[in-house]
Regions:
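Pyridoxal 5′-phosphate
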Residues: 1-389
Length: 389
């Protein structure tokens, strides 16, 4: 199988991740922070070390305990948004967002708790920070923006948006589902108050683990309560971090895989991985643009771009193209709206049932890309389209 669905989850994982998870769970598959025997202590140390690595990667701050774990980015976004948004607030977000942002905000707005404004993106796929500024109202308190689009791969101007937020006294939450481990995140430099991450994408970990980093001075109301393993006589849930946003037995196997994945990313270098992927992406983009009947969306520059590409073939439903790629060429991709319907409203692809998305990862090869290009050429030829010489 040629796997080009890395925006959904990276696959395969590095062999080091599989090996570490297997060994760790066999030798240390116990609950951290609950007991004083050696395996429990060592498991707790792994959790702490993972918090430290991610805090440093995101440049969150001095307190690594403010790096908290959850099931995934969607889970953390629910925790953070429900914990930050109060009655009467106005929230600004963008048309680039995934449903992990859109649906919590929609639900809160429908309940009459907040008002939401959706800022569009331009023809290149980027949000203009001035549009964020123009959308500010007297009761605006929060801006929520994706780090990178999961549909078109554009890396948003987070530092410039963060500057707008700081100048206007707004809190800034960034959904780093597609950004963490793929591109730089410097929370302090970029003015980001909360950064959301998931483990199973560019951090090269397993599914079922994600989290957030909340900077000092940002208040998140508690929405989860239960066991913490410490100070059990206290009747209410603990308010200090990390316990404030964590409750119950942790997914320690997920943390172990995340630890190994992050180490692999750091050892290989975020920039090195990204540059290698973008070399493949550029060839894919350039060649697909030369096929008659093929529309490639955005993808105007290699700068501020992740190795993600969406396209359609005239005369085909995207789902049918995906099926042909799978059955005839053994290429795995994603079709449809990619859980980001407002992106497709602007692209004009709602009536086309979305796009065909090819998303590259660190283990793709030039041979994979050549096969994908040939496949799209041959599918387009079924409608009489030819390669533009």
């Amino acid at each position: 199988m040629i796997y080009l669905d890395n925006s959904a989850t990276t696959y395969p994982k590095p062999v080091e991740v599989y090996g570490f998870m297997n060994d760790f769970y066999r030798d240390h598959g116990v609950s951290p922070g609950r007991s004083g025997f050696d395996a429990a202590i060592e498991t707790g140390e792994l959790v702490t070390e993972t918090r430290k690595m991610l805090t440093k990667m995101f440049n969150g701050g001095d307190d690594y305990n403010r790096l908290t774990f959850s099931y995934n980015a969607t889970d953390s976004l629910n925790i953070i948004l429900q914990g930050m948004i109060e009655k009467g607030m106005h929230v600004i977000t963008t048309m680039l967002e995934h449903n992990s942002v859109l649906r919590p905000l929609y639900t809160l707005e429908k309940k009459g708790i907040c008002e939401v404004t959706y800022v569009p993106f331009d023809e290149r796929g980027y949000v203009d920070p001035d549009d964020i500024k123009k959308a500010i109202k007297p009761n605006t308190r929060l801006v929520v923006c994706t780090h990178c689009s999961n549909v078109i791969g554009t890396v948003q101007p987070i530092a410039k948006i963060g500057k707008v937020c700081k100048e206007n006294g707004l809190l800034f939450v960034v959904d780093g589902s597609q950004g963490a481990g793929a591109v730089e995140m410097d929370m302090q430099k970029f003015g980001v108050d909360v950064y959301i991450f998931t483990g199973h994408k560019c951090l090269m970990g397993p599914t079922g683990i994600g989290g957030s980093y909340v900077r000092e001075g940002v208040t998140i109301k508690q929405t989860r309560f239960g066991g913490t393993g410490v100070r059990s006589a206290v009747p209410g849930h603990l308010e200090e971090y990390p316990y404030r946003l964590e409750a119950g037995t942790m997914n320690i196997l997920g943390v172990a895989g995340l630890y190994a994945g992050v180490k692999w990313v750091l050892n290989n270098g975020i920039r090195n991985i990204h540059d290698a992927e973008m070399k493949l992406w550029k060839k894919l983009r350039d060649r697909l643009r030369m096929i008659e009947g093929v529309t490639v969306y955005c993808a105007t520059s290699e700068e501020d771009q992740n190795p993600v590409l969406s396209f359609n073939i005239e005369g085909f439903n995207g789902g049918d193209v995906g099926t042909i790629l799978d059955v005839d060429y053994d290429i795995a991709c994603r079709t449809g709206l990619q859980c980001a319907p407002k992106v497709h409203e602007i692209l004009g692809t709602i009536d086309l049932h979305g796009t065909v998305r090819l998303s590259l990862g660190p283990f793709n090869t030039m041979e994979d890309i050549d096969t994908a290009i040939t496949a799209v050429e041959e599918i387009a030829a079924l409608k009489g389209f030819q390669y533009k010489c």
